[in-house]
Curated annotation (Swiss-Prot):
Belongs to the RbsD / FucU family. RbsD subfamily. It comes from Aeromonas hydrophila subsp. hydrophila (strain ATCC 7966 / DSM 30187 / BCRC 13018 / CCUG 14551 / JCM 1027 / KCTC 2358 / NCIMB 9240 / NCTC 8049). This is D-ribose pyranase. The active site is at H20. Homodecamer. GO terms for molecular function: D-ribose pyranase activity; intramolecular lyase activity; monosaccharide binding. Pathway: Carbohydrate metabolism; D-ribose degradation; D-ribose 5-phosphate from beta-D-ribopyranose: step 1/2. It is found in: Cytoplasm. It holds the Pfam family RbsD_FucU. Catalyzes the interconversion of beta-pyran and beta-furan forms of D-ribose. Its EC number is 5.4.99.62. Gene3D superfamilies: RbsD-like domain. GO terms for cellular component: cytosol. The lineage of its organism: Bacteria, Pseudomonadati, Pseudomonadota, Gammaproteobacteria, Aeromonadales. Substrate binds at D28, H106, Y128, A129, N130.
Length: 139
């Protein structure tokens, strides 16, 4: 049995394949998922698992240097936005490397998701609760 924190086989394999600047989209239950990127569907029911839980799991193994969010989250879902920013800032401190946060319009976010290695669907139902994680390097 695997010893690490991240036990989900498809997620673990995805993280192992990531190179510097490769991207993973972590999305809510409603984001349209394009053909092309690998689809890892973790959604069980509304709210389960939450985006925060999926992000926590991924951050146990993935070095992240940049995160992209839809700018609409700041106005439409401010509490969720602040929780994500807090989580990312805490992780940046723990990994000893900064994480840049960038914003774009939701339509541009959806277009950008097409270049992700994979799209990981959570059960999150908060509007605009979607992230693109850009991989950093561990050295």
């Amino acid at each position: 049995m695997k010893r690490g924190v991240l036990l989900n086989a498809p997620l673990s394999a995805l993280v192992a394949r990531m190179g510097h600047t490769d991207e993973i989209t972590v999305c809510d239950a409603g984001l349209p998922i394009p053909a092309g990127p690998e689809r890892i569907d973790l959604a069980l029911m509304a709210g389960t698992p939450s985006l925060e839980t999926v992000l926590t799991a991924l951050l146990t193994d993935l070095v992240v240097e940049k995160v992209i969010m839809a700018s609409e989250i700041k106005q439409i879902s401010p509490a969720a936005h602040q929780a994500l920013v807090d989580q990312l800032e805490a992780h940046a401190a723990a990994q000893g490397k900064p994480i840049t946060i960038e914003y774009c319009l939701h339509e541009a976010f959806k277009a950008r998701s097409h270049q992700s290695k994979a799209i990981v669907r959570s059960g999150e139902v908060t509007p605009y609760a979607n992230l693109i994680l850009c991989a950093g390097v561990a050295f």
